[in-house]
A protein has these predicted regions:
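Structural detector for internal amphipathic alpha-helices that build alpha-solenoid repeat scaffolds
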Residues: 2-19, 29, 37-51, 60, ...
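Amphipathic alpha-helical scaffolding segments comprising HEAT/armadillo-like alpha-solenoid repeats
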Residues: 17-32, 51-63, 82-95, 115-131, ...
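Short inter-helical turns and helix N-cap capping residues of alpha-solenoid HEAT/ARM repeat scaffolds
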Residues: 34-35, 65-66, 97-98, 134-135, ...
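Residue-level recognition of hydrophobic positions within alpha-helical transmembrane segments
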Residues: 68-71, 92
């Protein structure tokens, strides 16, 4: 089986079955090869990994020269369980030169902060980022992350970003609202949307 077929099949299977040691070894090999599309696929697949090795591969991919690979790795690191991952995501959410990477690093940082008992630190850090971050996609993810961490006052700012010109950003706002929508806030979200 060639690499492309292996990656596509594993991408479909990984949601339902655990990644085997043999498959993990092959993913590690591909993560070190030249094809950036394949490296990005490795990162996408590893969101389904529950192993330290999967997290280590993703951490390595956050250093990739290709920003799409870094973005996919950051997105998949929502599974992270270590302070090393927390610190790497924190750094990327602030310092990566590409907004897409900063945005995905922000959401994954939020996702792993609870398991590491770092919510208070994360909230302070993310709120400080609001003062300097200009990229709309990153701001969407900052508002979403802060809302998910209990800072409900950021919902209105998130909804206001539905007015931005780029449809990709409006789609990201809609996705974020769908992600945070539940029985406890659906009335409030619908009210804000109707007022908006």
């Amino acid at each position: 089986m060639d690499k492309d077929q292996f990656l596509m099949e594993l991408y479909e299977e990984a949601y339902e079955t655990e990644i085997s040691d043999e498959q993990m070894g092959k993913l590690k090999e591909i993560a070190n090869e030249d094809d950036s599309f394949n490296r990005a696929m490795v990162a996408k697949i590893l969101v389904n990994s529950e192993s330290e090795e999967g997290e280590e591969i993703l951490l390595k991919l956050t250093h990739d020269k290709d920003s799409l690979v870094r973005a996919e790795a950051c997105d998949s690191l929502c599974i992270g369980e270590t302070m090393e991952t927390y610190e790497r995501l924190k750094k990327l959410s602030e310092k990566d030169r590409v907004g897409l990477v900063r945005g995905y690093a922000t959401i994954s940082l939020c996702d792993i902060s609870e398991g590491l008992n770092m919510q208070s630190d994360t909230i302070k850090f993310l709120e400080s980022r609001l003062d300097v971050e200009k990229v709309v996609f990153v701001r969407i993810n900052l508002y979403t992350a802060l809302y998910k961490m209990g800072k409900r006052e950021y919902l209105k700012q998130l909804v206001q970003l539905l007015d931005v010109p780029r449809y990709q950003n409006r789609g990201a706002v809609a996705n974020s609202l769908g992600e945070i929508l539940d029985e406890s806030n659906e009335e409030e979200i619908f009210k804000i949307l109707l007022e908006h």
